[in-house]
Curated annotation (Swiss-Prot):
Source species, domain of life: Bacteria
SUPFAM superfamilies xref list: DNA repair protein MutS, domain I (SSF55271), DNA repair protein MutS, domain II (SSF53150), DNA repair protein MutS, domain III (SSF48334), P-loop containing nucleoside triphosphate hydrolases (SSF52540)
Organism: Syntrophobacter fumaroxidans (strain DSM 10017 / MPOB)
InterPro entries: DNA_mismatch_repair_MutS, DNA_mismatch_repair_MutS-lik_N, DNA_mismatch_repair_MutS/MSH, DNA_mismatch_repair_MutS_C, DNA_mismatch_repair_MutS_clamp, DNA_mismatch_repair_MutS_core, DNA_mismatch_repair_MutS_N, DNA_mismatch_repair_MutS_sf
Keywords linked to the UniProt accession: ATP-binding, DNA damage, DNA repair, DNA-binding, Nucleotide-binding
GO molecular function, one term: damaged DNA binding
Name listed for the protein in its UniProt record: DNA mismatch repair protein MutS
Pfam families: MutS_I (PF01624), MutS_II (PF05188), MutS_III (PF05192), MutS_IV (PF05190), MutS_V (PF00488)
Length: 889
């Protein structure tokens, strides 16, 4: 049986404490992984899997990554949803007696990332936790970005709403009690990249959670946080705190607030809406480019970019808060010099939030603190700029402005600028900070001069002109003499090393000097590390002030950026109120107009309310611009609710509580859902959750099934939205079912619109203008021709269309080319009935035969004749079931 080595025994003891993590074990210049960890990591990192003790009967799988490049590999493991424990050597190997002591110095999980290179600058990185009631129908959700100290909680009344909120928050990691079953969470890793981490049920205990929160915030109770009675939210927040403290292995004093919120305070745009409106991700560009945030984000700081994203995820429903933002944007938009100065100063500021987070958790470097200092040095000028502004939001920012000059000053006086990347080599602390340190620095610095003088002296004393005095980290200080001069070596020289062409020696004098210098160097490094640790602690005590300042910087950055966008693209300041109106003049799509040549985007007006124009049925061919008009209306409403100016010449927007979209059609293979099932589930979600305050965007309903079924469903959905709670719901309904225009006859608040086109010399001209009335034709063949279908296909399609429009079934065309050889030509072949409402003739015969002409007055006969004529001409009349059944065949 193989004996376990001391090193492997140490590894196993440490690994036992972190069974759910990949343990990176420092050995010299590498981090090594063993056993199952090695197998997992080698696959994820695409590195070689080897083995330890190859001569042994039992080989131990092993892989490793270079120490200097470890962060990149760690980032890949964490991105794959893995928990990583970093085990470092915590004593100098040269001083170790036996095995070098090692300890886990940090644990990194998907939701607990602090290193800047492992984080997207303008994206939050949330760790979330969910607790549930005994019945499992009420939930508490808490989430924390440890890198920025953002800590929030909410209580939710249904499983469906919980999933909706989780998708909106988009955490990287979700903590769940291992005592409960969570079938609703099973698809989260696959569909949304959320890593699930089971946690002991005791971590979700209400009393334990409250004690943990009270202890962390150093308060007597949680009443001041406004979370009294939110037991489920407190349990979730307590679980996050316990998990963070167990894994970060450091202080988290920068987390100073826990903010509760209510879903009812914000507009909800569900997952389909976020995707279809391309708020954060463009389907065309497959990334941020081409999305709404890509157009709006002119922020200059990382924390400003994150706050703008938060505004878009949580649009406001409070008019006072909306107006507060909008007035600040208006003031900056009207003052170009001030806006330019503000944006210029903001561009010099680093990510203060995350620098503060790293410092508070004890992971900041000298470069981090110098970056913090340089950022804070811009705050006095920003504060002076704010003094000239008068809008309520900006005046409040100025009143609470903190220059943090004392923090910047202490860093300035303590650290050299620029500093080295780390502390290992020293050279970090400024002269004058410590007399003792200055003494050791002089000793280290003067060593080179002493060596040069000593070399001159030894050459003179020995007569060896080629004698050299040198130093390296392995052998220390030495005298090197070539083999040709060995006969001249004095007796007080002691041989230290033999080379091919020379010998290296040491003297008592050189040995004494070496001891003094090395001790001085060691003392210098120890002192520098202690002074830096003291500086870290001093700055950490100001974490709350720094966090508050970062939040104000982000706020100023957001309103300045939106003011810049408003001026650059000629946006207007919308009127926002509690009415049910949406009135837009010259509305534009903010993204599409950006990518079109100047002046080529066609603006459109839109008028909606719940009294006159509530359901707008929009018809017209593909490529006419229906989808653009629908999406731009939703985006303008959304932008109004974050306080932004909007792309229009005028806009009046009544508060909207939800925006729903049903756009496009595609399979959802990941969930095993067909195109039609996806369409119907999205439509069902709209019908179940929309309110009279909602805005609904429907871009085709019923395309994924047969024409009859599709039209029937679309018709019923439109009726339901019109009639809902007698008020109805504001709806933009684009469709190719021209039959839906008949709804305007039976529903008073349905209005027909079409996107104007003209046909000229068999070409179709798109005007992209929304006009009243339904479209008379779909122009599908012309669009197909523009798409490049062969002329023989589009020509044949025109023939068939003419036959259908004349009420005749199409006849098969004679085959051409090889298909015709050996077959007798037939002038025409029988077709099938294809018109949607075309009836078989039996119903007309039956109706005429049923007339009692002998007992009918002339007037009654005319009335019956007129009724038959209308039924023949009409397309929406209802026939007997037997006739309809035959018509479908």
């Amino acid at each position: 049986m193989n004996k376990i080595t001391p090193m492997m025994q140490q590894y196993l003891e440490i690994k036992e404490k972190y069974p759910d993590a990949l343990l990176l074990y420092r050995m010299g210049d590498f981090y090594e992984m063993f056993m199952d960890d090695a197998v997992t990591a080698s696959g994820l990192l695409e590195i070689a899997l080897t083995s330890r003790d190859r001569q042994s009967e039992v080989r131990i799988p092993m892989c490793g990554v270079p120490y200097h490049a470890a962060e990149g590999y760690i980032a890949r493991l964490v991105s794959a949803g893995k928990k990583v424990a970093i085990c470092d050597q915590v004593e100098d190997p040269r001083k170790a007696k036996g095995l070098v002591r090692r300890e886990v110095t940090r644990v990194i999980t998907p939701g607990l990332v602090l290193d800047a290179q492992n984080l997207a600058a303008k994206q939050p990185n949330y760790l979330a936790a969910v607790s549930n009631s005994t019945a499992g129908e009420r939930f508490g959700l808490a989430f924390l970005d440890v890198s920025t100290a953002e800590f929030k909680m909410v209580e939710i009344e249904s499983r469906e709403a919980l999933l909706e909120e989780l998708i909106r928050v988009s955490p990287r990691e979700l903590l769940l009690s291992d005592d409960d079953e969570h079938p609703w969470a099973e698809e989260l890793p696959k569909l949304y990249g959320i890593a699930l981490t089971p946690l002991g049920a005791d971590r979700f205990d209400g009393k334990r959670a409250e004690e943990a929160l009270v202890g962390h915030f150093r308060v007597h109770s949680l009443e001041g946080f406004g979370i009294s009675g939110m037991d489920l939210g407190i349990r979730a927040a307590g679980a996050i705190l316990a998990y963070m403290q167990a894994n970060l292995l450091g202080s988290c004093d920068h987390i100073t607030r826990l903010l509760p919120y209510s879903r009812g305070d914000f507009m909800i745009v569900d997952e389909a809406g976020v995707r279809n409106l391309e708020i954060f991700h463009s389907q065309s560009f497959q990334g941020r480019k081409g999305s709404l945030i890509d157009i709006l984000d002119e922020t200059k700081t990382a924390m400003g970019g994150r706050k703008l994203q938060q505004w878009l995820r949580y649009p406001l429903l409070d008019l006072a808060r909306i107006n507060n933002r909008r007035e600040a944007i208006a003031e900056l938009a009207a003052n170009a010099p001030m806006r330019g100065e503000t944006l210029g100063l903001l561009s010099r500021i680093s990510d203060v939030e995350r620098l503060n987070g790293r410092n508070s958790t004890g992971t900041s470097t000298p470069r981090d603190l110098v970056a913090l200092k340089k950022s804070l040095q811009n705050l006095p000028a920003l504060g002076a700029a704010l003094a000239e502004l008068t809008s309520p939001r900006l005046s409040e920012l100025r009143a609470r402005w903190d220059d943090l000059a004392d923090v910047a000053d202490i860093i300035e006086r303590t650290l050299l600028d620029p500093p080295p990347p780390g502390l290992a080599a020293g050279g970090v602390i400024s002269a004058g900070v410590s007399e003792e340190l200055d003494h050791f620095v002089r000793l280290s610095r003067d060593a080179k001069g002493w060596m040069a003088d000593y070399e001159v002296q030894q050459r003179r004393d020995t007569g060896i002109s080629s004698l050299k005095v040198r130093y390296n980290k392995v052998f220390g200080y030495y005298i090197e003499i070539s083999n040709a001069n060995l006969n001249s070596v004095p007796e007080h020289y002691f041989r230290k090393q033999t080379l091919v062409n020379a010998e290296r020696f040491i003297t008592e004098e050189l040995k004494t000097f070496e001891t003094q210098v090395l001790q001085a160097e060691e003392k210098r490094l120890e002192l520098e590390q202690q002074i830096f640790a003291d500086l870290r602690a001093r700055i950490a005590r100001e974490a709350g002030r720094i966090q508050a300042a970062a939040d104000r910087i982000a706020d100023l950055d957001c309103v300045s950026a939106l003011a810049e966008v408003a001026c650059r693209y000629d946006y207007c300041r919308p009127v926002m109120d509690e009415s049910d109106a949406i009135r837009i003049r010259d509305g534009r799509h903010p993204v599409i107009e950006h990518y079109l040549k100047d002046g080529t985007f066609v603006p459109n007006d839109l008028d909606m309310d719940q009294r006159d124009q509530q359901v707008l049925v929009i018809t017209g061919p593909n490529m006419a611009g229906k989808s653009t008009i629908l999406r731009q209306a939703a985006l303008i409403v959304l932008m109004g609710h974050i306080g932004s100016f909007v792309p229009a010449s005028e806009a009046h927007i009544g508060l909207v509580d939800r925006i729903f979209t049903r756009v496009g059609a595609s399979d959802d293979l990941a969930r095993g859902r067909s195109t039609f099932m996806v369409e119907m589930q999205e439509t069902a979600n709209i019908l179940h959750h929309a309110t009279p305050r909602s805005l609904i965007i429907l871009d085709e309903i019923g395309r994924g099934t047969s024409t009859y079924d599709g039209l029937s469903i679309a018709w019923a959905v439109a009726e339901h939205l019109h009639d809902f709670q007698e008020k109805g719901i504001k709806t933009l309904f684009a469709t190719h079912y021209h039959e839906l225009t008949e709804l305007a006859r039976s529903r008073p608040r349905v209005r027909n619109f079409n996107v104007a086109i003209r046909e000229w010399q068999q070409e179709i001209l798109f005007f992209h203008k929304l006009v009243q009335g339904g479209a008379s034709r779909s122009y599908g063949i012309q669009v197909a021709r523009l798409a490049g279908l062969p002329e023989e296909v589009t020509g044949r399609a025109r023939e068939i269309l003419q036959q259908l429009e004349s009420g005749h079934a199409p006849f098969a065309a004679a085959p051409s080319g090889a298909a015709r050889r050996g077959r007798p030509a037939r002038e025409k072949e029988p077709g099938i009935q294809m018109s949607l409402f075309q009836r078989s003739p039996e119903w007309l015969r039956d109706r005429i035969l049923a007339l009692d002409l002998d007992n009918m007055t002339p007037i009654a006969a005319l009335q019956n004749l007129h009724a038959l004529k209308e039924q023949i001409r009409g397309s929406a009349g209802e026939e007997p079931a037997s006739c309809a059944s035959r018509g479908k065949r």
